């Protein structure tokens, strides 16, 4: 074959491989018919941003259908996705892509991909070497990526739950950072997360991918230039005390981020959808407890252990384990409230979703309430899907979930009508985990309203302090996503309790060691596990 013929053949193959789409103002009839009305403009926004920057952040609220809209964008762009997501979400991605008729190159979880592996077939059990990525020895050169990508030209890479990749020092963070080489090759990268950022420093990797900074190490220097760029957000009030000034500075920083990244983001807010989305009432609710004094004492002990950790005292090597045991004890002492409130809502014809942190709490509640549907870290995918199916079909009226196992990527909304959902939740350490858990019941397509309650114990000041701390982080998320400091705040209400029933005393059960807690998945590089318990 001569040079001219070879050149022409390359042109033909490249034309087939890379879709030539320069703008998009309407969706195809096939795609449009499968989207809710409020999703259509968002899909067009995703496509427009990808065509301009080859990078987009979808920060839409949990439950509006980010998976479906990402798949729709792939279809409209004519690209075959490589999906990187938590393992529990793999079957959902496969079914959604099939729904849109989108063929994919790969669907793989973070841990498998970081080890240069993927799955052999659609059963997602047996692994093989991944042809699209390999680890790179950068010889101590921090400017070199930790992974090298080699993907087809018509691919699109989607990082689902991308808030798991916000720390540049973790393997997850390095994996996401390495995707910049794809963006530079005009291969689109999509990040999906309703909680991409809880604090200013969480934006290091997004800023790097957006080419604002040459490396995440340049983040602080870039931040100083933003203060000059946005003088309207300088904190000038000299009468603020130290705590007030800290809050004001953080608020200003998050609003600056909102301004800086808005060209790269698209977002659907539930509160803008009106009656297109199920009514969702939520608050943190206080309940009286006979064990409030013991719970307060446990928090005092946690606060003291935290202070000793901050002071780096030599004898505190077991403090983190002690803190976990105390947190579990506090959750166990809330069991009577969970039982009473669950029975109350069942009598009202509601279906109840319970979120807790520890497997021991889950086991006791399951026995007391005869719960058959469970979502936890030590079950198979088939067991997990069976529990979801029984609850979604309204065969079972209660489902109980560990927050880290059941707070992401599952839908528990009322599909058929007449079975309104109630969520009862013990708050987790992370504001992101809280938002994710509270997004399981209010989903697009739900047929009934949702009531959600974060369980607090009255007369325990530490619980209210924790809620204030969580609200601050939620305000950061809201400000970065929407430029609104009030978007995700939970009101603290007083709750009423019935006459106490005679229940087995939960705190006599053995305390779990934190190393056996399946809520924690060390391979997924989850962050923000140890907040300051006394922060206000």
Curated annotation (Swiss-Prot):
Which enzyme class? hydrolase
Catalytic reactions on record: ATP + H2O = ADP + phosphate + H(+)
- Which Gene3D superfamilies does its entry note? P-loop containing nucleotide triphosphate hydrolases
Annotated coiled-coil segments of the chain: 288-334
The record's annotation in SMART domains points to: DEXDc
Sorted alphabetically, the Gene Ontology BP terms of this entry are: DNA repair; replication fork processing
Q: Which SUPFAM superfamilies match?
A: P-loop containing nucleoside triphosphate hydrolases (SSF52540)
**What positions does the entry give for ATP binding?**
60-67
Q: Which residues form the Helicase C-terminal domain?
A: 338-486
Whether Acyltransferase counts among this entry's keywords is no
InterPro entries the record matches: Helicase/UvrB_N, Helicase_ATP-bd, Helicase_C-like, P-loop_NTPase, SNF2/RAD54-like_C
Q: Where is the Helicase ATP-binding domain?
A: 47-214
For the motif DEAH box, what are the positions? 160-163
* EC number(s) per entry: 3.6.4.13
- Name the segments for region: Disordered: 502-536
Which keywords does this chain's UniProt record carry?
ATP-binding, Coiled coil, Helicase, Hydrolase, Nucleotide-binding
GO molecular function terms listed in the Swiss-Prot or TrEMBL record: ATP binding; ATP hydrolysis activity; DNA binding; RNA helicase activity
- Family of the protein in this entry: Belongs to the DEAD box helicase family. DEAH subfamily.
Q: What is this protein called?
A: Putative ATP-dependent RNA helicase L364
